[in-house]
């Protein structure tokens, strides 16, 4: 009960530097890509609360799907249908674009899912995909793997799609700050769960998180990037 109250409280801080994931709250890279998908039938795999739908160009036909176990039980998802990404309930060449954000790390068969995406895409159809890289295990036990940029490109192209863009989702210094903030947040949550004396340090952890977040954000604007260290990747591809 205490941990659920803590989670709700922390969620209220999501868009402030007090939140351990504040450095991830800027979705401009992904939302910018969503606006370029054009009209047509857009399939959103792992749609959760369907936030993608509001970011798409006017005139799109949107279909959101999610996996029942994680989508419904963990996130309260509201899809058009519950389905397995490795066995999509759509006809061949029936969609113009597929959006799959922070999902394939949770799939036991990501290669099969990418082949399914290629199957339902029309020739020339687009894929917009994002994945974490340097990021803690989450949604356990449904967190199975991480991909490097080279491994991700290989899997996409193996499925019959051509990568046109693959970029880090967060700079190196912001990623370093994010990891430290997540570690502090995770330890604070564990202290609450175990009812240990560590809860007394919660105010200091919150202060440290806010300082690290702001410092990392500013440093990221001033220092050159290093693509070997990133919280994740955003990829754009087309079906050949």
Predicted regions and their residues:
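Conserved N-terminal segment of class I S-adenosyl-L-methionine
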Residues: 1-93, 97, 101, 114, ...
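S-adenosyl-L-methionine-dependent methyltransferase catalytic module, highlighting the catalytic core
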Residues: 7-8, 12, 16-17, 82, ...
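A short His-aromatic
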Residues: 102, 106
